[in-house]
C-alpha cells in the first residue's frame, strides 16, 4: 500500500479547513501476496502498478468529492468505450467484524454516506457484504472479463479509520484540531488489469487516439516510392501523429498481412498514383475498403478523429 506515504505528506504540516480538500495522486507500485490459485494473467498479480489518489477533506465535502470521482470514472470509461459495468457498494461482513478497524457507529455512518451518494446520483448499484476494505466501505466498479471473472476496475473508498490511527489533523472553523476524512480513489485501478480488460474489450484494436502507432506506411517499391513515403511520414509526425514507415525490402502483400495482424488503425499503401498525385490510399485493419484522399485531407481527418477520440 502507498496510503501511508500520502498520509505522511498530509501530516508534514498543519492545515486549515480552508485548505481542504487536498488531493494527492501518484502512479505507484503495489505488492500483494495473492493465493496462487487466484493469480490470473495480468488481471490479478502479486505485483502491480496503480494510479492511486487520496483526498483529504472535511465531512461536509464527502458527497461532492465522491460524486466528482464517480464523474471522472464515467468520463474515462466513455473515452475508452466501456459500457458493460456495474457499481457495487462493498460493505463489511457483519458476522466477522473483528477483521475491520473501527466501531459500529463509524462503519454505519460511512456505509450510509456512500449508499446515499449512489442513490442521489441515480446510478444503479448492488450491495455486497464482506467486500469492504479493512478500514472502510467502497464503491467498486465491477467488470466481467472474457473468461467470466467479475473484477474490480475502479474504486472509491471512504475512510474514517486511518486518519485516527495516523493522528491526522486540521484546524476547523472553531480553531480546533479535528480529524479529516480520507477518500481513496483509483480511477483505472491496477493499470495491468485495466490494460488486460481493454485488450479483451477491443480484441486488440485499440482506438486511434490510444494506438502506439496510429498510421503504418507501406511504399510499394522502395526504389520509386520510398522518398514520397518519407515525406508523408515527416508531415504526419509534424502534426503529432504517431507513424511507422515499413521500408523493409519485402513484398507488399507480406507487409500488408503483418500490418493487419499488428492492428494498425490506418494502413497507407503508396504507389505510382499516390506519388505522382501527392495523395494517399488507406485502409484499416478491420476493413478491406480502400479510400484515396489528398495528403492534407488525410492529415485533417486523422487529427479530428484523435481530437474527438473517435473509436
List PLM regions with ranges.
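NTP/phosphate- and nucleic-acid-binding module
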Residues: 1-311
Amino acid at each position: 500500500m502507498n496510503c501511508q506515504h500520502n498520509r505522511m505528506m498530509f501530516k508534514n504540516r498543519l492545515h486549515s479547513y480552508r485548505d481542504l480538500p487536498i488531493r494527492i495522486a501518484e502512479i505507484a507500485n503495489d505488492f500483494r501476496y495473492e493465493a496462487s490459485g487466484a493469480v490470473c494473467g495480468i488481471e490479478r498479480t502479486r505485483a502491480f502498478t496503480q494510479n492511486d489518489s487520496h483526498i483529504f477533506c472535511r465531512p461536509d465535502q464527502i458527497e461532492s468529492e465522491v460524486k466528482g470521482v464517480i464523474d471522472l470514472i464515467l468520463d474515462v470509461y466513455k473515452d475508452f468505450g466501456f459500457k458493460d459495468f456495474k457499481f457495487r457498494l462493498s460493505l463489511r461482513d457483519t458476522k466477522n467484524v473483528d477483521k475491520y478497524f473501527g466501531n459500529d457507529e463509524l462503519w454505519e455512518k460511512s456505509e450510509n454516506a456512500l449508499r446515499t451518494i449512489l442513490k442521489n446520483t441515480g446510478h444503479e448499484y448492488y450491495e455486497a457484504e464482506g467486500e469492504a476494505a479493512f478500514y472502510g466501505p467502497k464503491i467498486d466498479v465491477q467488470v466481467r472479463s472474457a473468461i467470466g471473472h467479475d473484477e474490480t476496475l475502479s474504486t472509491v473508498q471512504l475512510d474514517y479509520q486511518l486518519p485516527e490511527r495516523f493522528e491526522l489533523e486540521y484546524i476547523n472553523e472553531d480553531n480546533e484540531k479535528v480529524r479529516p476524512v480520507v477518500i481513496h480513489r483509483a480511477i483505472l485501478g491496477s493499470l495491468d488489469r485495466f490494460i488486460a480488460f481493454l485488450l479483451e474489450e477491443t480484441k486488440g484494436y485499440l482506438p486511434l487516439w490510444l494506438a502506439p502507432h496510429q498510421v503504418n506506411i507501406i511504399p510499394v517499391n522502395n526504389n520509386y516510392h520510398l522518398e514520397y513515403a518519407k515525406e508523408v511520414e515527416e508531415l504526419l509526425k509534424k502534426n503529432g501523429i504517431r507513424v511507422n514507415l515499413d521500408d523493409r525490402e519485402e513484398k507488399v502483400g507480406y507487409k500488408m498481412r503483418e500490418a493487419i495482424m499488428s492492428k494498425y488503425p490506418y494502413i497507407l499503401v503508396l504507389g505510382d498514383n499516390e506519388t505522382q498525385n501527392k495523395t494517399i490510399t488507406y485502409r484499416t485493419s478491420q476493413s478491406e475498403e480502400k479510400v484515396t484522399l489528398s495528403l492534407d485531407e488525410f492529415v485533417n481527418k486523422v487529427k479530428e478523429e484523435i481530437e474527438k477520440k473517435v473509436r
